[in-house]
Amino acid sequence: MNRLTILVLFIFFLNQCSFSEKSRLWKDKEKESAVNYNIKEIFSEEKKITTELNQELKLDLSKIISSNEILKNKNNYGSQDYSGLINKIGNYKFSKFDNINQLNYKPLFLDDGLIFFDNKGSIIRYDSNQKVLWKTNHYSKSEKKLKPKLNLIISGENLLIADNIAKYYSVNINTGKLNWLKSNSYPFNSEIKTNKKYFFAVDYKNTLRCYNVNDGSECWSLQTEKSFMIPNSKYSLIIIEDMVIFSNSIGDITAVDIESGLINWQLPTQRSNILQERYNFKNSKLVSDGKAIFFSNNEQEFYSVDVKTGTINWINEISSNLTPIIIGNLVFTVSDDGYLHVLEKNTGNIIRITDLFINYKIKKRKKIKPIGIAIGGTKLYLTNTDGKMIIVDLSHGNVINVEKVAGNFTSKPFIFNQNLFVIRNGSIVQYN
Protein backbone atom coordinates (compact mmCIF):
# COMPACT_ATOMS: atom_id res chain seq x y z
CA MET A 1 0.00 0.00 0.00
CA ASN A 2 2.83 2.33 0.86
CA ARG A 3 4.55 1.53 -2.44
CA LEU A 4 1.39 2.29 -4.38
CA THR A 5 0.93 5.56 -2.54
CA ILE A 6 4.52 6.60 -3.25
CA LEU A 7 4.19 5.72 -6.94
CA VAL A 8 0.99 7.74 -7.31
CA LEU A 9 2.56 10.72 -5.57
CA PHE A 10 5.68 10.47 -7.78
CA ILE A 11 3.62 10.44 -11.00
CA PHE A 12 1.54 13.35 -9.72
CA PHE A 13 4.72 15.31 -8.96
CA LEU A 14 6.09 14.74 -12.44
CA ASN A 15 2.85 15.83 -14.07
CA GLN A 16 2.67 19.00 -12.04
CA CYS A 17 6.31 20.03 -12.07
CA SER A 18 8.07 18.56 -15.06
CA PHE A 19 5.55 18.38 -17.85
CA SER A 20 3.04 21.06 -16.96
CA GLU A 21 3.38 24.29 -18.90
CA LYS A 22 2.32 26.13 -15.77
CA SER A 23 5.20 24.79 -13.70
CA ARG A 24 8.15 26.94 -12.65
CA LEU A 25 10.56 24.79 -14.64
CA TRP A 26 8.57 25.31 -17.82
CA LYS A 27 8.16 29.03 -17.13
CA ASP A 28 11.89 29.50 -16.74
CA LYS A 29 12.47 27.75 -20.04
CA GLU A 30 9.79 29.87 -21.71
CA LYS A 31 11.31 33.02 -20.22
CA GLU A 32 14.76 32.06 -21.48
CA SER A 33 13.31 31.38 -24.93
CA ALA A 34 11.59 34.77 -24.97
CA VAL A 35 14.83 36.56 -24.08
CA ASN A 36 16.68 34.79 -26.86
CA TYR A 37 13.90 35.65 -29.30
CA ASN A 38 14.07 39.36 -28.43
CA ILE A 39 17.81 39.46 -28.88
CA LYS A 40 17.50 37.85 -32.27
CA GLU A 41 14.78 40.28 -33.37
CA ILE A 42 16.75 43.37 -32.39
CA PHE A 43 20.23 42.49 -33.55
CA SER A 44 19.82 39.94 -36.35
CA GLU A 45 17.65 41.68 -38.93
CA GLU A 46 17.87 40.62 -42.54
CA LYS A 47 19.09 43.22 -44.99
CA LYS A 48 17.10 43.40 -48.18
CA ILE A 49 19.14 43.13 -51.37
CA THR A 50 18.01 45.65 -53.99
CA THR A 51 17.97 44.72 -57.67
CA GLU A 52 17.07 46.70 -60.77
CA LEU A 53 13.52 46.54 -62.11
CA ASN A 54 12.04 47.45 -65.52
CA GLN A 55 15.29 49.02 -66.73
CA GLU A 56 13.89 49.44 -70.24
CA LEU A 57 10.79 51.31 -69.07
CA LYS A 58 10.70 54.89 -70.38
CA LEU A 59 8.76 57.42 -68.33
CA ASP A 60 6.58 59.90 -70.19
CA LEU A 61 7.60 63.19 -68.56
CA SER A 62 6.48 65.41 -71.44
CA LYS A 63 3.73 66.98 -69.33
CA ILE A 64 6.04 67.98 -66.49
CA ILE A 65 5.78 71.69 -65.74
CA SER A 66 8.94 72.99 -64.09
CA SER A 67 8.83 76.09 -61.94
CA ASN A 68 10.66 78.01 -59.24
CA GLU A 69 7.67 77.81 -56.92
CA ILE A 70 8.38 75.70 -53.87
CA LEU A 71 5.54 74.66 -51.58
CA LYS A 72 7.74 75.26 -48.56
CA ASN A 73 5.23 74.40 -45.89
CA LYS A 74 4.69 70.98 -47.52
CA ASN A 75 8.37 70.35 -48.41
CA ASN A 76 7.05 69.66 -51.92
CA TYR A 77 9.80 70.72 -54.34
CA GLY A 78 8.65 68.92 -57.49
CA SER A 79 10.49 69.56 -60.75
CA GLN A 80 12.25 72.92 -60.75
CA ASP A 81 13.40 75.10 -63.61
CA TYR A 82 17.06 74.28 -64.32
CA SER A 83 18.78 73.57 -67.65
CA GLY A 84 21.63 71.63 -66.05
CA LEU A 85 24.80 73.02 -67.62
CA ILE A 86 26.80 72.52 -64.37
CA ASN A 87 29.12 75.46 -65.00
CA LYS A 88 30.46 76.99 -61.79
CA ILE A 89 29.63 80.72 -61.72
CA GLY A 90 29.79 81.72 -58.05
CA ASN A 91 31.16 80.95 -54.60
CA TYR A 92 29.63 82.28 -51.37
CA LYS A 93 32.35 81.93 -48.73
CA PHE A 94 32.02 81.53 -44.95
CA SER A 95 34.26 80.25 -42.12
CA LYS A 96 34.44 76.44 -42.04
CA PHE A 97 32.51 74.30 -39.58
CA ASP A 98 34.48 72.14 -37.12
CA ASN A 99 34.09 68.36 -36.89
CA ILE A 100 31.30 68.23 -39.41
CA ASN A 101 30.03 64.92 -40.80
CA GLN A 102 26.95 66.19 -42.58
CA LEU A 103 25.73 69.48 -44.07
CA ASN A 104 22.01 69.15 -43.50
CA TYR A 105 21.30 72.87 -43.38
CA LYS A 106 19.70 75.00 -46.06
CA PRO A 107 20.51 78.53 -47.26
CA LEU A 108 17.66 80.99 -47.60
CA PHE A 109 17.43 81.93 -51.26
CA LEU A 110 16.38 85.45 -52.24
CA ASP A 111 15.78 87.00 -55.65
CA ASP A 112 18.91 89.11 -55.16
CA GLY A 113 21.17 86.75 -53.16
CA LEU A 114 21.04 84.38 -50.22
CA ILE A 115 21.42 84.11 -46.43
CA PHE A 116 23.49 81.56 -44.50
CA PHE A 117 25.60 81.30 -41.33
CA ASP A 118 29.18 80.51 -40.36
CA ASN A 119 31.18 78.56 -37.77
CA LYS A 120 30.48 81.02 -34.92
CA GLY A 121 26.78 81.48 -35.61
CA SER A 122 27.16 84.73 -37.56
CA ILE A 123 24.32 85.32 -40.02
CA ILE A 124 25.52 86.54 -43.42
CA ARG A 125 23.47 88.11 -46.20
CA TYR A 126 25.04 88.04 -49.68
CA ASP A 127 23.97 89.77 -52.86
CA SER A 128 23.77 87.95 -56.21
CA ASN A 129 27.47 88.72 -56.87
CA GLN A 130 28.55 86.90 -53.66
CA LYS A 131 29.29 90.22 -51.93
CA VAL A 132 28.47 90.41 -48.20
CA LEU A 133 25.73 92.99 -47.58
CA TRP A 134 25.67 92.53 -43.82
CA LYS A 135 26.99 90.14 -41.19
CA THR A 136 25.66 89.96 -37.66
CA ASN A 137 26.22 87.80 -34.59
CA HIS A 138 23.98 87.71 -31.51
CA TYR A 139 25.95 85.23 -29.39
CA SER A 140 28.21 85.80 -26.40
CA LYS A 141 31.88 84.83 -26.45
CA SER A 142 31.19 81.57 -24.62
CA GLU A 143 28.24 80.75 -26.91
CA LYS A 144 30.37 81.25 -30.02
CA LYS A 145 32.70 78.52 -28.76
CA LEU A 146 29.75 76.10 -28.88
CA LYS A 147 29.63 76.57 -32.69
CA PRO A 148 25.86 77.08 -32.96
CA LYS A 149 24.09 75.64 -36.02
CA LEU A 150 21.13 77.68 -37.23
CA ASN A 151 17.79 76.84 -38.80
CA LEU A 152 16.45 79.82 -40.73
CA ILE A 153 13.14 80.94 -42.21
CA ILE A 154 11.76 84.22 -43.56
CA SER A 155 8.60 85.82 -42.19
CA GLY A 156 7.77 89.07 -43.95
CA GLU A 157 10.66 91.48 -43.44
CA ASN A 158 12.13 89.41 -40.65
CA LEU A 159 14.36 86.37 -40.34
CA LEU A 160 13.48 83.77 -37.70
CA ILE A 161 16.23 81.59 -36.22
CA ALA A 162 16.19 78.50 -33.95
CA ASP A 163 19.54 76.90 -33.07
CA ASN A 164 21.11 73.82 -31.49
CA ILE A 165 22.13 75.63 -28.27
CA ALA A 166 18.51 76.40 -27.25
CA LYS A 167 18.23 79.99 -28.47
CA TYR A 168 15.67 81.42 -30.86
CA TYR A 169 15.41 84.97 -32.13
CA SER A 170 14.38 87.34 -34.91
CA VAL A 171 16.41 89.83 -36.95
CA ASN A 172 15.51 92.34 -39.64
CA ILE A 173 16.20 90.82 -43.04
CA ASN A 174 17.46 94.10 -44.53
CA THR A 175 19.87 95.12 -41.76
CA GLY A 176 20.49 92.13 -39.49
CA LYS A 177 19.35 94.19 -36.51
CA LEU A 178 17.99 92.13 -33.62
CA ASN A 179 14.22 92.31 -33.06
CA TRP A 180 14.02 89.99 -30.05
CA LEU A 181 15.89 87.02 -28.53
CA LYS A 182 14.74 84.22 -26.21
CA SER A 183 15.94 80.88 -24.83
CA ASN A 184 14.33 77.44 -24.72
CA SER A 185 14.87 74.70 -22.13
CA TYR A 186 16.34 72.34 -24.73
CA PRO A 187 18.23 72.80 -28.03
CA PHE A 188 16.24 72.67 -31.25
CA ASN A 189 16.65 69.85 -33.76
CA SER A 190 14.24 70.59 -36.59
CA GLU A 191 13.55 72.81 -39.52
CA ILE A 192 11.27 75.79 -38.86
CA LYS A 193 7.83 76.30 -40.35
CA THR A 194 5.70 79.44 -40.16
CA ASN A 195 2.29 80.76 -41.03
CA LYS A 196 1.14 84.37 -40.73
CA LYS A 197 1.40 84.78 -36.95
CA TYR A 198 3.09 81.63 -35.59
CA PHE A 199 6.27 79.69 -36.16
CA PHE A 200 7.03 76.13 -35.10
CA ALA A 201 10.11 74.11 -34.12
CA VAL A 202 10.81 70.82 -32.34
CA ASP A 203 13.46 70.48 -29.63
CA TYR A 204 15.57 67.50 -28.52
CA LYS A 205 12.94 66.57 -25.93
CA ASN A 206 10.56 65.72 -28.80
CA THR A 207 8.47 68.78 -27.90
CA LEU A 208 6.76 70.79 -30.62
CA ARG A 209 6.74 74.47 -29.69
CA CYS A 210 4.57 77.22 -31.14
CA TYR A 211 5.85 80.80 -30.88
CA ASN A 212 4.48 84.22 -31.74
CA VAL A 213 6.30 85.70 -34.74
CA ASN A 214 6.20 89.26 -33.39
CA ASP A 215 7.75 88.81 -29.95
CA GLY A 216 8.79 85.15 -29.58
CA SER A 217 6.35 84.42 -26.77
CA GLU A 218 5.32 80.77 -26.52
CA CYS A 219 1.71 80.14 -27.56
CA TRP A 220 1.64 76.46 -26.65
CA SER A 221 3.80 73.34 -26.57
CA LEU A 222 3.17 69.63 -27.08
CA GLN A 223 5.55 67.00 -25.72
CA THR A 224 5.61 63.58 -27.36
CA GLU A 225 7.34 60.46 -26.07
CA LYS A 226 10.99 61.01 -25.21
CA SER A 227 13.91 58.87 -26.31
CA PHE A 228 17.13 58.14 -24.46
CA MET A 229 19.05 58.15 -27.74
CA ILE A 230 20.53 61.24 -29.42
CA PRO A 231 18.96 61.47 -32.90
CA ASN A 232 21.13 61.26 -36.01
CA SER A 233 18.78 63.28 -38.19
CA LYS A 234 16.73 66.45 -37.90
CA TYR A 235 13.02 66.27 -37.24
CA SER A 236 10.66 67.43 -39.96
CA LEU A 237 7.57 69.63 -40.01
CA ILE A 238 4.91 70.45 -42.59
CA ILE A 239 1.87 72.72 -42.42
CA ILE A 240 -1.36 71.72 -44.17
CA GLU A 241 -4.39 73.97 -43.72
CA ASP A 242 -5.02 74.20 -39.96
CA MET A 243 -2.57 71.46 -38.93
CA VAL A 244 1.13 71.30 -38.23
CA ILE A 245 2.44 67.75 -38.70
CA PHE A 246 5.84 66.66 -37.40
CA SER A 247 8.13 63.70 -36.84
CA ASN A 248 10.21 62.95 -33.75
CA SER A 249 13.22 60.83 -32.80
CA ILE A 250 11.26 57.61 -32.21
CA GLY A 251 9.43 57.65 -35.55
CA ASP A 252 6.06 59.00 -34.38
CA ILE A 253 4.18 61.25 -36.82
CA THR A 254 1.85 63.67 -35.03
CA ALA A 255 -0.76 66.07 -36.44
CA VAL A 256 -1.62 69.04 -34.21
CA ASP A 257 -4.22 71.79 -34.45
CA ILE A 258 -2.40 75.06 -35.06
CA GLU A 259 -4.61 77.22 -32.84
CA SER A 260 -5.17 74.95 -29.84
CA GLY A 261 -2.08 72.72 -29.84
CA LEU A 262 -4.28 69.63 -29.42
CA ILE A 263 -3.48 66.36 -31.19
CA ASN A 264 -5.66 65.52 -34.21
CA TRP A 265 -3.99 62.15 -34.76
CA GLN A 266 -0.74 60.31 -34.07
CA LEU A 267 0.91 57.46 -35.97
CA PRO A 268 3.70 55.42 -34.30
CA THR A 269 5.85 53.84 -37.01
CA GLN A 270 8.45 52.05 -34.87
CA ARG A 271 8.46 49.81 -31.81
CA SER A 272 10.15 51.73 -28.99
CA ASN A 273 12.09 48.72 -27.61
CA ILE A 274 13.79 48.31 -30.99
CA LEU A 275 14.57 52.02 -31.28
CA GLN A 276 16.36 52.04 -27.93
CA GLU A 277 18.93 49.72 -29.52
CA ARG A 278 19.00 51.17 -33.04
CA TYR A 279 20.70 54.44 -32.22
CA ASN A 280 21.21 55.23 -35.91
CA PHE A 281 17.51 55.41 -36.81
CA LYS A 282 16.86 58.10 -39.43
CA ASN A 283 13.66 59.45 -40.94
CA SER A 284 13.43 61.41 -44.17
CA LYS A 285 11.68 64.76 -44.27
CA LEU A 286 7.91 64.71 -44.48
CA VAL A 287 6.58 65.66 -47.93
CA SER A 288 2.95 66.23 -48.89
CA ASP A 289 0.79 66.90 -51.93
CA GLY A 290 -2.00 68.13 -49.64
CA LYS A 291 -3.82 64.79 -49.50
CA ALA A 292 -1.13 62.34 -48.40
CA ILE A 293 2.16 62.51 -46.51
CA PHE A 294 5.18 60.66 -47.88
CA PHE A 295 8.29 59.75 -45.88
CA SER A 296 10.75 56.91 -45.44
CA ASN A 297 13.41 55.70 -43.02
CA ASN A 298 16.56 53.59 -42.97
CA GLU A 299 14.59 50.59 -41.65
CA GLN A 300 13.27 49.63 -45.12
CA GLU A 301 9.95 51.46 -44.77
CA PHE A 302 8.46 53.98 -47.21
CA TYR A 303 5.06 55.33 -46.11
CA SER A 304 2.07 57.08 -47.61
CA VAL A 305 -0.27 58.40 -44.89
CA ASP A 306 -3.63 60.12 -45.18
CA VAL A 307 -3.39 63.77 -44.14
CA LYS A 308 -6.83 64.00 -42.52
CA THR A 309 -6.88 60.77 -40.50
CA GLY A 310 -3.29 59.54 -40.15
CA THR A 311 -4.22 56.13 -41.54
CA ILE A 312 -1.64 54.34 -43.67
CA ASN A 313 -2.40 54.31 -47.40
CA TRP A 314 0.48 51.95 -48.19
CA ILE A 315 3.98 50.88 -47.09
CA ASN A 316 6.77 49.71 -49.37
CA GLU A 317 10.19 48.23 -48.59
CA ILE A 318 12.67 50.99 -49.39
CA SER A 319 15.49 52.00 -47.06
CA SER A 320 16.16 55.72 -47.44
CA ASN A 321 16.38 58.85 -45.30
CA LEU A 322 16.45 61.17 -48.34
CA THR A 323 13.61 63.63 -48.94
CA PRO A 324 11.34 62.13 -51.63
CA ILE A 325 10.14 64.23 -54.56
CA ILE A 326 6.59 64.18 -55.94
CA ILE A 327 5.90 64.90 -59.62
CA GLY A 328 2.35 64.32 -60.84
CA ASN A 329 1.41 60.72 -60.01
CA LEU A 330 5.02 59.66 -59.42
CA VAL A 331 7.27 59.69 -56.36
CA PHE A 332 11.06 59.59 -56.69
CA THR A 333 13.58 58.56 -54.05
CA VAL A 334 17.07 57.03 -53.83
CA SER A 335 17.77 54.17 -51.42
CA ASP A 336 20.72 53.98 -49.04
CA ASP A 337 22.56 51.69 -51.47
CA GLY A 338 22.20 54.04 -54.44
CA TYR A 339 19.15 52.75 -56.31
CA LEU A 340 16.67 55.21 -57.84
CA HIS A 341 13.09 54.09 -57.11
CA VAL A 342 10.09 55.37 -59.05
CA LEU A 343 6.73 54.70 -57.37
CA GLU A 344 3.11 55.28 -58.27
CA LYS A 345 1.87 57.86 -55.78
CA ASN A 346 -1.59 56.42 -55.16
CA THR A 347 -0.75 52.70 -54.93
CA GLY A 348 2.88 52.62 -53.81
CA ASN A 349 3.73 50.22 -56.62
CA ILE A 350 7.38 50.41 -57.70
CA ILE A 351 7.47 50.78 -61.48
CA ARG A 352 11.23 51.13 -62.00
CA ILE A 353 14.47 50.67 -60.06
CA THR A 354 17.81 51.86 -61.45
CA ASP A 355 21.31 51.41 -60.01
CA LEU A 356 22.90 54.89 -59.87
CA PHE A 357 26.13 53.57 -58.29
CA ILE A 358 26.72 51.21 -61.21
CA ASN A 359 30.02 52.87 -62.15
CA TYR A 360 31.53 52.38 -58.67
CA LYS A 361 33.53 49.29 -57.84
CA ILE A 362 31.96 47.05 -55.19
CA LYS A 363 34.51 47.93 -52.50
CA LYS A 364 34.13 51.66 -53.17
CA ARG A 365 30.33 51.78 -53.25
CA LYS A 366 30.07 50.17 -49.81
CA LYS A 367 31.66 53.32 -48.35
CA ILE A 368 29.42 55.78 -50.21
CA LYS A 369 26.01 57.02 -49.12
CA PRO A 370 23.54 59.27 -50.94
CA ILE A 371 23.03 62.72 -49.40
CA GLY A 372 20.13 64.28 -51.26
CA ILE A 373 18.35 64.77 -54.57
CA ALA A 374 16.84 67.58 -56.62
CA ILE A 375 15.02 67.44 -59.95
CA GLY A 376 15.50 70.08 -62.63
CA GLY A 377 13.33 69.59 -65.71
CA THR A 378 13.67 65.89 -66.54
CA LYS A 379 17.06 65.41 -64.86
CA LEU A 380 17.75 64.21 -61.34
CA TYR A 381 20.80 65.46 -59.40
CA LEU A 382 22.15 63.24 -56.60
CA THR A 383 24.96 64.25 -54.25
CA ASN A 384 26.97 61.62 -52.34
CA THR A 385 29.38 61.40 -49.41
CA ASP A 386 32.37 61.15 -51.77
CA GLY A 387 31.75 64.74 -52.93
CA LYS A 388 30.40 63.73 -56.34
CA MET A 389 27.11 64.63 -57.99
CA ILE A 390 25.45 62.08 -60.27
CA ILE A 391 23.21 63.45 -63.03
CA VAL A 392 20.43 61.16 -64.25
CA ASP A 393 18.07 61.24 -67.23
CA LEU A 394 14.75 60.54 -65.51
CA SER A 395 12.96 59.41 -68.66
CA HIS A 396 15.30 56.45 -69.23
CA GLY A 397 16.86 56.24 -65.76
CA ASN A 398 20.45 56.19 -67.02
CA VAL A 399 23.42 58.11 -65.59
CA ILE A 400 24.50 60.80 -68.06
CA ASN A 401 27.24 62.57 -66.09
CA VAL A 402 29.18 62.60 -62.82
CA GLU A 403 30.61 65.88 -61.45
CA LYS A 404 33.06 66.39 -58.60
CA VAL A 405 31.58 69.21 -56.48
CA ALA A 406 33.45 68.82 -53.16
CA GLY A 407 36.43 67.10 -51.57
CA ASN A 408 34.20 64.97 -49.35
CA PHE A 409 31.03 66.03 -47.58
CA THR A 410 28.56 68.23 -49.37
CA SER A 411 24.91 69.11 -48.95
CA LYS A 412 21.95 67.99 -50.98
CA PRO A 413 21.58 70.03 -54.20
CA PHE A 414 19.28 73.07 -54.20
CA ILE A 415 17.72 74.65 -57.28
CA PHE A 416 16.60 78.28 -57.35
CA ASN A 417 16.12 80.81 -60.18
CA GLN A 418 17.54 78.44 -62.82
CA ASN A 419 20.71 77.87 -60.79
CA LEU A 420 21.93 74.90 -58.77
CA PHE A 421 23.65 75.29 -55.39
CA VAL A 422 25.55 72.90 -53.12
CA ILE A 423 27.06 73.62 -49.71
CA ARG A 424 30.66 72.62 -49.12
CA ASN A 425 32.45 73.16 -45.83
CA GLY A 426 33.44 76.80 -46.18
CA SER A 427 31.41 77.86 -49.21
CA ILE A 428 28.17 77.61 -51.16
CA VAL A 429 28.91 76.88 -54.81
CA GLN A 430 26.58 78.16 -57.53
CA TYR A 431 26.19 76.51 -60.96
CA ASN A 432 24.24 77.72 -63.99
Q: What positions do the PLM features span?
A:
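Short loop/turn segments that connect beta-strands within beta-propeller blades
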Residues: 127-131, 172-176, 212-216, 258-261, ...
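Beta-strand-rich domains and repeat architectures in extracellular enzymes and scaffolds
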Residues: 49-120
